[in-house]
């Protein structure tokens, strides 16, 4: 080393020494304290500020007082003049108290997921926790970012989704849809996604979900289609769904007369007088005469749709058109001349002609003329347009709509459905119209239909435009079109949108000379309604509420104010004042802005409920009741106010003078006066010189000639009741008074021409003939008594004829409509099919069991049965339906039971549970379809295949998780480890000293050898050899399996483990090849002995270096007991009492044992210490004692030569042990382990095979059907009762039951036999063990458990419980007696009783009322009898008749009294003396005829003419009177001569 290098080395040593001196002394084993963390500051990475509440204490000062008394000297007290007194003193001092308050302070901490390390400014290290990372993020402790996110998520905690669609649209051709953690591509309609999941391919749009069409899809192009409906349907507005066309819309449903839609089907009806033909379409005339429906008194003449009654000669047809009356006097038909003055129909009455109008017309005020009714004013039918026609109206629709099938509503016409409406590309249907549009890259033509590419040359907008000749006062200015294509960076979409906006050249006309308007014809002088001229004199400045060029238009709806620029804020249909904007609310709505209310047609708290108020009516906000406009009323505002009522709710009474008023306005109550009257209430007549309605017309009569105030005619004033030039004509019908100028107010009846008193026609009464006759009266003056009409019929107040209710006919309405007819006068034929019964009044069909519908033509829907399908089925929901007639449940596949409430028994499925399941290996069978649900470990249609290798569990969906090539259990996935492996996943090798399957075998390896974990082969430690490593290496060999040869020379011995040579004295070297020289041997090797036991002599020190297991100066002593190895430093681990080898540590086992822990007995064939001796036992199966080597027979053998096996039932050494195997199992002669026979398993064969298993060790699976067991030995199926077949796959045949189906069933009357035990399940109506007994009276149904509910001694059908009604009753429970007019079984018999007599509902016998008798009560009581059955006799004097009902005597004229035994009193006459005489002059009247018997010179019919003779007061006359009388007063004789005295 050079001097320079030595100097440098010395310098480094000095520096190192200084460093070591300067370092603090740290004791050995002491820990270094952690470095403090830097304080966190705002703004540092991952530092979060948090608020926390802390208690802060502080001292709060308070003033306190202390009071006490002090002694003081006081003067003037006591005998010494001084004394000691006490005074109170108070001392104030300052105290403090501790006060705590809660304060919030900001604390800086590491954000969640981060922590701070020493010397870090902030929180820079990740801190992992279970809930730190979201969406499957992985936390890496100490990393720069706490969470490592999976693809699709980002953020420090993976809390944010990555929107892949933001970058290049995610690679999608059409649409990119972002999803949490991923994304997906979608295609536009008409395309489908390609296999790359990014590009889109065009598809046949009809092939995908039928194009969304409900019926047919018609492909137009590869991406466009059109929906089409089946015949009888039409396309809805959505272009996809179809609705059924009204069957009446097409040719009136093929009906001749009327077509009605009933439950979606066309139902033809005929007018009155016609009946439906057999084809259900045509209408045939009903021959009322032949059917007996006319009820004409004399003759009947059939006409089309009606009939006409005719009378015999000398008779005239009555007003009812049926009765005939003898002609007593000449009757003039008031309708023969000029149709009675009627413009349409005329009917002759006793009061004169009665005018009638056809439908759609009404009588005018003259009661003669028919005027058309404006049906559009009252009809709520038409939705859009209503056109009134004479006698009717017609609905119409706006352009773009068509009339609905009901003739009222309007449907939008889908113009796009037909050739796309003429659009070249796309057509969009709108309400009442349509709109064409173009695809991308095209623009719409001027015709608004065609499309042209944007690449087409544009019109040269900069070219010369055609010259336009200016109009007078007009200048034409042309605007330049903005440049179509600009250079600025505008997106392609905006460019295209701009181009499709159709830029066109515009022209603007400018008026000159202060004119304006479209033709420059207006000036400021034309401004109206307060409008002023604008400053430029080019228009009008309109005031509030007005708009338009000249302010002649009111503001448009929903605007108001100046220039109509303000929007109204009125809600719920309110209208606003065009000037002020104030809201006018409709009925039912209030508030400043009409906010307290709902829009038209809705109500409720949230205005979500619908109401249906006609005629623009609104409904109550809360209750939905209709709030009608003035003039309307009714539940739905569909009625106009009655006469002389008006206003909201028709609550106001018109104040018009009714006789002078034509009508009263229903809305505001204003009066429309009749001709000749005027005034607000029509209270005044016309002033002179005026006439007509309202008196607005001026008369044109000459001066002095009166003018008729009604007609304006000139003429003289005729007396009341007359008119004409000479006042010789009576007032025409309907007028009265002076000049017949007043109109009768008699409701169409005539009135007295002078007084105006009404002459009411038959059936009317009252001052104005507005009242009908009272109940029970008819005719003129309502003087006639109505006949006894039956069945709630009333009599016609005009004719007295009974007006039958629908369903009844006859002169007294006593007959019910004949079968097959119903309605008024029984003129409509019933349409009930399938044995349905027709109600005689309404025609409503009462359907037979199993049928329903208007005409009983529709079978019961699923879930209902019985008459009119009125009974709900009592079958388990969804598991079965019931028979429409009987109600018995018809079970769906997979269900049985009376209500189909039970699933098929195990092993059966399908309809009636008649099919056998074919599932194997214990799989569950679906009771409906028979589909197999495989248990874990099996797959296949019938679960016949085990799981493939590597899979297990249900449907073999789970993959095995075993290592080392181990297979897994197909059921639970547990690993089946191969030999040498163990653990749940077979990931562990066998522990030491074990090998084989499940490491269950013990290794037979000794002297520290290891064994192969698979087959147990020993791997010997160095120095040992042999199968069990029991043999030490022979001399000259060492190492593994003693394969190496020793190299020791000169008598040296080698270590059998390491091969090291132990040299004899005088020799040294690795192979003892060197001879020791005197100078080479140090003191330790000086002695002749040298180092012993293989010890080596250290050439430097001369000390012996002892090998393992030896100690001492010359290595002469082995290790002390309990120690071994190098320097005897290792402690032995042998069991107590066993020494260990001082070199290897191997335990020195007692004779007969071996192993590292002496835990194993000597292997067979060896014995003694270390099992080193070999047994020398003779015989075939010997065994020697492992310790002593004494010979004996091996376990399982006996005999002198050990050649005999143990007899059955014994095992072990000397065959001394008894076997414990059951069920015929045999045991191993050596170990006693049981070998079970077929069908058994267990340690002692005590267990039979579990259900479903059989064979050796129960390894085979039974193939029997569910519910069947199999023989555990042979696998033969043991069928349960009711099953048969090799695999019990068949049920018993009919009428067989029991085990093997060997027994015959004994069920009768259709009873079902239980296949298992033969018990009978009786059908409805039967009971008993063998179903041999019918249900007793009063019981029915299954097992006769139900009680009949039939009344009136009726019986019930034993199967269904249907009541069998006795005569006179009907109904489901026979609870109703026959209706009046019917009797007998089923109430089919018709009663023919007359005069309103009822009949007995059972026998049909007529129960005659008092006054009648006979079989049909057709005869009245004979004279002299009365009462019920006419059995009572009259008690009247003089043969006077009596009332046949009451027996009261009907006295003849001149007689009275209870028995007609009294003469009439003076002044009375007639029948029963009920009339009063009208005789004057003291005359009496005849008590019979009432004729007056004059006295005292009176004469005349009433004796009021003439009187007694009086003498004159003149004497001359008196004197003459004594001689002769005037000639005129002389009495004459009968012969005409003078009377003789």
UniProtKB/Swiss-Prot annotation:
Name used for this protein in its record: Multiple epidermal growth factor-like domains protein 6
Domain EGF-like span(s) in chain numbering: 124-159, 161-201, 206-242, 238-284, 285-325, 335-370, 375-411, 412-452, 516-552, 560-595, 603-638, 736-770, 783-814, 822-857, 865-901, 909-944, 955-987, 995-1030, 1038-1073, 1081-1116, 1124-1159, 1211-1246, 1254-1289, 1297-1332, 1345-1375, 1383-1418, 1469-1504
UniProt superkingdom: Eukaryota
Biased composition (Polar residues): 1516-1535
Record's keyword terms, sorted: Calcium, Disulfide bond, EGF-like domain, Glycoprotein, Repeat, Secreted, Signal
Region forming the signal peptide: 1-30
Recorded name of the encoding gene: MEGF6
Tagged with keyword Secreted: yes
Record-annotated EMI domain positions: 44-125
Chain spans, region Disordered: 1509-1541
Disulfide cysteine pairs (residue numbers): 48-111, 77-83, 110-123, 128-139, 133-147, 149-158, 165-176, 172-185, 187-200, 242-255, 248-268, 270-283, 289-300, 296-309, 311-324, 416-427, 423-436, 438-451, 520-533, 527-540, 542-551, 564-576, 570-583, 585-594, 607-619, 613-626, 628-637, 740-751, 744-758, 760-769, 786-795, 789-802, 804-813, 826-838, 832-845, 847-856, 869-882, 873-889, 891-900, 913-925, 919-932, 934-943, 999-1011, 1005-1018, 1020-1029, 1042-1054, 1048-1061, 1063-1072, 1085-1097, 1091-1104, 1106-1115, 1128-1140, 1134-1147, 1149-1158, 1215-1227, 1221-1234, 1236-1245, 1258-1270, 1264-1277, 1279-1288, 1301-1313, 1307-1320, 1322-1331, 1348-1356, 1350-1363, 1365-1374, 1387-1399, 1393-1406, 1408-1417, 1473-1485, 1479-1492, 1494-1503
Location in the cell: Secreted
InterPro entries named in the record: cEGF, EGF-like_Ca-bd_dom, EGF-like_dom, EGF-type_Asp/Asn_hydroxyl_site, EGF_Ca-bd_CS, EMI_domain, Growth_fac_rcpt_cys_sf, LE_dom
GO molecular function: calcium ion binding
Glycosylation-annotated residues: 252, 739
Stored Pfam families: cEGF (PF12662), EGF_CA (PF07645), EGF_laminin (PF00053), FXa_inhibition (PF14670)
Keyword DNA repair: no
Any single GO CC term annotated in Swiss-Prot or TrEMBL for this entry: extracellular region
């Amino acid at each position: 080393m050079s001097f320079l290098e030595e100097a440098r080395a010395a310098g480094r040593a000095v520096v190192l020494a200084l460093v070591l001196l300067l370092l603090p002394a740290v004791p050995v084993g002491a820990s270094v304290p952690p470095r403090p963390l830097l304080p966190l500051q705002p703004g540092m990475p991952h530092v979060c500020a948090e608020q926390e509440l802390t208690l802060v204490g502080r001292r709060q000062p308070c003033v306190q007082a202390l009071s006490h008394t002090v002694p003081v000297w006081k003067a003037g007290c006591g005998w010494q003049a001084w004394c000691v007194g006490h005074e109170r003193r108070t001392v104030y001092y300052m105290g403090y108290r501790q006060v705590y308050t809660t304060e919030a302070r900001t604390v800086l901490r590491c954000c969640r997921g981060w922590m701070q390390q020493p010397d870090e400014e902030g929180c820079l290290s990740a801190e992992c926790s279970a809930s730190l990372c979201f969406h499957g993020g992985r936390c890496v402790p100490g990393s720069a970012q706490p969470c490592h996110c999976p693809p699709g998520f980002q953020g420090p905690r993976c809390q944010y989704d990555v929107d892949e669609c933001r970058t290049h649209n995610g690679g999608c051709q059409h649409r990119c849809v972002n999803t949490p953690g991923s994304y997906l591509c979608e295609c536009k309609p008409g395309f489908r996604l390609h296999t790359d999941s990014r590009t889109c391919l065009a598809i046949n749009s009809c092939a995908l979900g039928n194009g969304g069409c409900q019926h047919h899809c018609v492909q137009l192009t590869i991406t466009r289609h059109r929906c089409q409906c089946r015949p009888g349907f039409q396309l809805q507005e959505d272009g996809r769904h179809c609705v059924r066309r009204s069957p009446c819309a097409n040719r009136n449903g093929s009906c001749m007369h009327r077509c009605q839609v009933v439950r979606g089907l066309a139902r033809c009806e005929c007018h009155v007088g016609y009946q439906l033909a057999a084809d259900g379409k045509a209408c045939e005339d009903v021959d009322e005469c032949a059917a007996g429906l006319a009820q004409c008194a004399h003759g009947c003449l059939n006409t089309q749709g009606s009939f006409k009654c005719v009378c015999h000669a000398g008779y005239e047809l009555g007003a009812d058109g049926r009765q005939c009356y003898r002609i007593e006097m000449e009757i003039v038909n008031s309708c023969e001349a000029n149709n009675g003055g009627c413009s349409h129909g005329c009917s002759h009455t006793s009061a004169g002609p009665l005018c009638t109008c056809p439908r759609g017309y009404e009588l005018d005020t003259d009661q003669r003329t028919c005027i058309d009714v404006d049906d559009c004013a009252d009809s709520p039918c038409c939705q859009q347009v209503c056109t009134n026609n004479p006698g009717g109206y017609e609905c119409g629709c706006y352009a773009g709509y068509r009339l609905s099938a009901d003739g009222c509503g309007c449907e939008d016409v889908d113009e796009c459905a037909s050739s796309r409406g003429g659009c070249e590309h796309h057509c969009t249907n709108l309400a009442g119209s349509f709109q064409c549009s173009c695809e991308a890259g095209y623009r719409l033509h001027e015709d608004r239909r065609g499309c042209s590419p944007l690449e087409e040359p544009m019109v040269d907008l900069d070219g010369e435009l055609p010259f336009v000749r200016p109009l007078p006062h007009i200048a034409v200015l042309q605007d330049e079109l903005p440049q179509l294509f600009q250079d600025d960076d505008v997106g392609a979409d905006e460019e295209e949108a701009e181009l499709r906006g159709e830029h066109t050249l515009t022209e603007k006309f400018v008026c000159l000379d202060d004119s304006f308007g479209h033709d420059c014809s207006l000036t400021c002088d034309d401004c109206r309604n307060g409008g002023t001229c604008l400053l430029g004199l080019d228009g009008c400045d309109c005031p509030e509420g007005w708009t338009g060029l000249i302010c002649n238009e009111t503001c448009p709806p929903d605007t108001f104010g100046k220039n109509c620029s303000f929007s109204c804020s009125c809600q719920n249909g309110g209208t606003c004042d065009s000037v002020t904007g104030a809201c006018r609310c409709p009925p039912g709505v209030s508030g400043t802005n009409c906010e307290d209310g709902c829009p038209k047609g809705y109500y409720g708290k949230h205005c979500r409920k619908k109401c249906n108020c006609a005629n623009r009516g609104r409904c109550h906000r809360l209750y939905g009741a209709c709030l009608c406009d003035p003039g309307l009323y009714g539940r739905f505002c569909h009625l106009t106010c009655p006469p002389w009522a008006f206003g909201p709710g028709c609550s106001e009474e018109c104040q018009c003078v009714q006789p002078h008023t034509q009508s009263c306005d229903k809305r505001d109550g204003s009066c429309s006066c009749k001709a000749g009257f005027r005034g607000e209430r029509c209270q005044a007549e016309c002033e002179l010189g005026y006439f007509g309605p309202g008196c607005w017309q001026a008369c044109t009569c000459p001066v002095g000639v009166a003018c008729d105030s009604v007609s304006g005619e000139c003429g003289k004033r005729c007396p009341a009741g007359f008119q004409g030039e000479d006042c010789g004509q009576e007032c025409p019908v309907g007028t009265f008074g002076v000049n017949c100028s007043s109109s009768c107010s008699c409701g169409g009846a005539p009135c007295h021409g002078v007084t105006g008193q009404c002459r009411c026609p038959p059936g009317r009464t009252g001052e104005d003939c507005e009242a009908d006759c009272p109940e029970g009266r008819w005719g003129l003056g309502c003087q006639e008594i109505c006949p006894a009409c039956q069945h709630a019929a009333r009599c016609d107040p005009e004719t007295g004829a009974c007006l039958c209710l629908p369903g009844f006919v006859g002169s007294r309405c006593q007959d019910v409509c004949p079968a097959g007819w119903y309605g008024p006068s029984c003129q409509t034929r019933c349409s009930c099919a399938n044995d349905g019964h027709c109600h005689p009044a309404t025609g409503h069909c009462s359907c037979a069991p199993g049928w329903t519908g208007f005409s009983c033509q529709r079978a019961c829907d699923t879930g209902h049965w019985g008459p009119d399908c009125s009974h709900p089925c009592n079958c388990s929901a969804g598991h079965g339906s019931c028979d429409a007639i009987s109600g018995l449940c018809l079970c769906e596949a997979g269900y049985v039971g009376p209500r189909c409430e039970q699933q098929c028994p195990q092993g059966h499925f399908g309809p009636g549970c008649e099919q056998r399941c074919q599932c194997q290996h214990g799989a569950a069978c679906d009771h409906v379809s028979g589909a197999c649900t495989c248990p874990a470990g099996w797959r296949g249609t019938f679960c016949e295949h085990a799981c493939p290798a590597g899979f297990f569990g249900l449907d073999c969906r789970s993959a095995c998780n075993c290592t080392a090539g181990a297979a897994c259990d197909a059921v639970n996935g547990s690993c089946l480890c191969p030999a040498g492996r163990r653990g749940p996943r077979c990931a562990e090798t066998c522990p030491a000293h074990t090998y084989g399957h499940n490491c269950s075998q013990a290794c037979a390896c000794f002297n520290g050898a290891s064994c192969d974990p698979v087959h147990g082969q020993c791997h010997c430690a160095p120095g040992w050899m042999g199968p069990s490593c029991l043999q030490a290496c022979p001399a000259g060999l060492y190492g593994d399996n003693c394969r190496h040869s020793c190299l020791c020379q000169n008598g040296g011995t080698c270590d059998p483990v390491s091969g090291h040579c132990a040299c004899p004295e005088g020799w040294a070297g690795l192979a003892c090849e060197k001879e020791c020289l005197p100078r080479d041997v140090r003191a330790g090797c000086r002695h002749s002995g040298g180092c012993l036991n293989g010890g080596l002599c250290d050439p430097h020190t001369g000390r012996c270096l002892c090998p393992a297991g030896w100690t001492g100066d010359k290595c002469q002593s082995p290790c002390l007991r309990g120690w071994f190895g190098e320097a005897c430093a290792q402690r032995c681990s042998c069991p107590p009492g066993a020494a260990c080898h001082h070199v290897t540590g191997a335990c020195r086992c007692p004779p007969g044992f071996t192993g590292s822990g002496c835990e194993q007995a000597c292997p067979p064939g060896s014995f003694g210490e270390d099992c080193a001796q070999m047994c020398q036992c003779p015989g075939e199966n010997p065994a020697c004692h492992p310790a002593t080597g004494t010979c004996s027979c091996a376990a399982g053998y006996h005999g002198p030569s050990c050649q005999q096996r143990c007899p059955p039932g014994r095992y072990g050494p000397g065959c001394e042990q008894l076997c414990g195997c059951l069920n015929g199992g045999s045991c191993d002669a050596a170990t006693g382990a049981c070998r079970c026979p077929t069908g058994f398993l267990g340690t002692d064969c005590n267990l039979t095979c579990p259900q479903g298993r059989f064979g050796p060790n129960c390894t085979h699976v039974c193939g029997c059907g569910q519910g069947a067991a199999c023989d555990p030995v042979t696998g033969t199926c043991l069928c349960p009762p009711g099953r048969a077949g090799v695999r019990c796959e068949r049920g018993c045949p009919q009428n067989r039951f029991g085990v093997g189906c060997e027994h015959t069933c004994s069920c009768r009357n259709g009873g079902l036999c239980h296949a298992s035990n033969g018990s009978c399940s009786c059908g409805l109506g039967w009971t008993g063990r063998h179903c041999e007994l019918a249900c007793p009276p009063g019981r029915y149904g299954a097992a006769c458990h139900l009680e009949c509910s039939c009344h009136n001694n009726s019986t019930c059908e034993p199967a269904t419980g249907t009541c069998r009604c006795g005569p006179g009753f009907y109904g489901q429970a026979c609870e109703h007696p026959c209706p009046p007019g019917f009797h007998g079984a089923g109430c089919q018999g018709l009663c023919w009783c007359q005069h309103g007599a009822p009949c007995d509902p059972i026998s049909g016998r007529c129960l005659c009322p008092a006054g009648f008798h006979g079989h049909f009560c057709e005869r009245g009581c004979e004279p002299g009898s009365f009462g019920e059955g006419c059995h009572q006799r009259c008690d009247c004097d003089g043969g006077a008749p009596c009332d046949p009902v009451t027996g009261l005597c009907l006295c003849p004229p001149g007689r009275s009294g209870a028995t007609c035994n009294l003469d009439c009193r003076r002044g009375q006459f007639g029948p029963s003396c009920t009339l009063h005489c009208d005789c004057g002059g003291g005359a009496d009247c005849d008590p019979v005829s009432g004729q007056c018997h004059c006295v005292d010179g009176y004469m005349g019919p009433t004796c009021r003419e003439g009187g007694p003779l009086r003498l004159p007061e003149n004497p001359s006359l008196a004197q003459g009177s004594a001689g002769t009388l005037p000639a005129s007063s002389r009495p004459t004789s009968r012969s005409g001569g003078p009377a003789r005295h």
